[in-house]
């Protein structure tokens, strides 16, 4: 079989093989029973319950069944049981099944946002404003709409599609090598829906695994379906309906919590779901006869959320299976007979992950009332006709489209093309709330003594204002740094990488002035700035942008407190600028890979101090290197300006242990080196926890007005510090302690990103 065979060819061969294999591939319940009667044995049904991570125990039980030589005639599985049971029914070998479970990247699967390296550069910039990736989304009528789930379903759907694509053409799951069915729950009526006829294996798994609140409901034939555990977590009756005479039931459901543990809203909500599940499980247990075998692994130490303990849970399942071995041997078949059955079960299944697909054409499935042109979706996917792509590469393309934030999920299918090629059909499911969104962000910083600062940011965006994807953003920030921004981002075409962005902004902030004789501030100024500009730029895919701008700026600085403050300064002038922003970091606050390069310059013929024109230029580069759990980080920055005090050093973010804004000047040189380790395994938190040390070197001085407004002149200053940080759902939280030589020691608490 050529390497480029398509899913359609595989499915056709599977169906042909199923029709030839006779008893091993019986379909209807009557055919199942007749085949078993012909062999003089009872029909064996395997029932696998739901239970989240506890469902990994099913793999261990299956290992024991294979060792004993038990032939399985039908499989019914719920939730996690549908994934394990469906994969086994489709032809996964035991090793493939185990490797699949052990190889899942659960951080990615359950991540609240796409990989940052795939996100559009505008969304990357939001990270530096401490804005969350999602917020309160609004319908076209202005009605607030909460998300359908806490976790995007994108990774789950891609995972299921990748693992089951060899049988995409099979729409009757009784025609799999082992007949299979999975219960789901109709979210509107509350009734059980049996996923077997007129559905793919992927659709059945997706519906049965749609945990309410965690994943969005599955859409099937116009209905909303959620986790089958709500109505039939241990589908014994379903297995009998499929033809089973004897049922091997594996129950891994979470038991009800004791009174002492119901002390918070999370525990109470979980108990409510478990109550519904427990009621239908008790009913199913009552349907077991003396011939049936119930296996209940000892999982008291594990919860449904222990997804990273799969190897341990599989072992518990195997242990429980061995305890039931004596009863299971009654159902065992001769080794030769079982081996022939297992070969027939697995021989037509070809894992699709590494199969290469030559792309003939890229299409977008039709969608009603879509506001996003198909050309834009295809351009974002970056799949070129004639290219050869693996499933992993096609998954990455779907993730790139999803990362724009306008879709509930983006999947795809491979239709047969001419001469063994594949037609990639993208299947984006657009959000109902892509019209506008509101997000709230902020930052907090304190030294537990004299200095505390807090900023609160409100941001509203109108999305997709025209077919080219325009966006109007407005931001208001209050706190230590008061700011207003309004900008209109307009791409210059559906697929062109060019854009234009007019904007206006106002900013006001106070800062201290230090003299040359000591560490105490001698004055406090308030600086205000108004800026209006038009930016013309070139987008570099997900990497960033380069652009030029023209605008008008008004700056004013006046004294608030202090003795003998410098004269008031005011400056107004038109200017032109250049901008470069390249960012592939995986995380802003705790990066482990990628890089960031920013450069910005502005020049004007007008001057402040009567010394020619006004020029400001700054470049910053940050590069992390990682090995296992360790990460080294290097950052460097250089600034040059004709404006005195344009750059500052000092505080928790620059030169830990020195006062905020301790040094300022028209020249800046700064570097830091950090070494950090992920210590999550030692902490009782789900969020990543980091501990690190760093050393900083920097200096800032004036070359315009002399050194009268900055202490230390051109001297280099050194700081050493240590920190512990948590990358939490509400943003980075960090505790830092450090010392700047010759200045002092400081302890700081920080929440949110701070430059």
Task: Outline where the language-model segments fall.
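Bacterial N-terminal signal peptides that target proteins for export
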Residues: 1-11
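Bacterial N-terminal signal peptides
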Residues: 11-20
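Patatin-like phospholipase
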Residues: 24-78, 86-399, 403-410, 415-416, ...
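Solvent-exposed coil/turn segments that connect beta secondary-structure elements
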Residues: 93, 102, 185-188, 198-200, ...
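Acidic/histidine-enriched alpha-helical segments
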Residues: 257-259, 329-347, 552-553, 594-597, ...
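Gram-negative/organellar outer-membrane beta-barrel architecture
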Residues: 392-397, 406-577, 585, 649-656, ...
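C-terminal outer-membrane beta-barrel translocator/porin domains of Gram-negative envelope proteins
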Residues: 423-425, 435-447, 563-566, 573-697, ...
